[in-house]
Design a protein with these regions (language model features):
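Catalytic-core regions of core metabolic enzymes
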Residues: 1-186
Length: 186
């Protein structure tokens, strides 16, 4: 289960109270949770999905999520336009349709307000009631910021990766719509 198992463990560690539905074609359980054999087997379309499969399979997963009404996805895999893979990122954008995606080549989003981590590691962060949202193209930058001990409460950490669908302005605007966000760091 790899990276996806890490995401499940981080949500559990942060006390996320919402449903978490791992999907794996052969495993019955991941991280102590029932695993579903396919997206079609889920109880309903997920609000948000961390996609931890290779770049070629990511396109198919995004298409299936979009068709079932998924709320959005983090596309973790690398090897898209940043590595010269011609046309694959355009296929991903077409597969997403109207569904927002962060990435590809994206580490994800951490929501310390609600304990929802679509991110493989939280790097020592803690739950907060309000705080700053940090946004970067590069996961490395916000990871390094998140590993620092600061007096500044961090509400969100988010990466854009290749920003194939959701761009900086759209993500920043969505984070600022949360009244618990006190400032935005880019």
């Amino acid at each position: 289960a790899g990276w996806a198992l890490n995401v499940i463990e981080q949500c559990q560690k942060m006390g996320f109270k919402g449903p978490v539905w791992p999907v794996h074609p052969t495993r019955a359980e991941i991280g102590g949770l029932k695993a579903y054999a396919s997206l079609a087997d889920l109880p309903e379309a997920p609000d948000a999905t961390f996609i931890g499969v290779n770049r070629f399979a990511t396109v198919d997963v995004v298409a299936e999520l979009a068709a079932m009404g998924g709320g959005g996805a983090i596309c973790f895999a690398s090897g898209w336009e940043e590595s010269g893979e011609a046309g694959l990122q355009e296929r991903l954008v077409a597969a997403a349709g109207d569904m927002p995606i962060l990435g590809p080549n994206c580490y994800g989003v951490i929501n310390y307000l609600d304990g929802a981590l679509l991110w493989p590691d939280q790097h020592g962060g803690i739950r907060v009631k309000n705080g700053v949202a940090l946004v970067s193209q590069s996961s490395n930058i916000v990871i390094n910021m998140g590993m620092q001990q600061r007096g500044l409460p961090v509400a969100y950490m988010a990466c854009l990766g290749n920003a194939a669908v959701v761009g900086l302005a759209e993500l920043a605007g969505a984070l600022l719509d949360d009244p618990r966000v006190t400032a935005l760091g880019l």
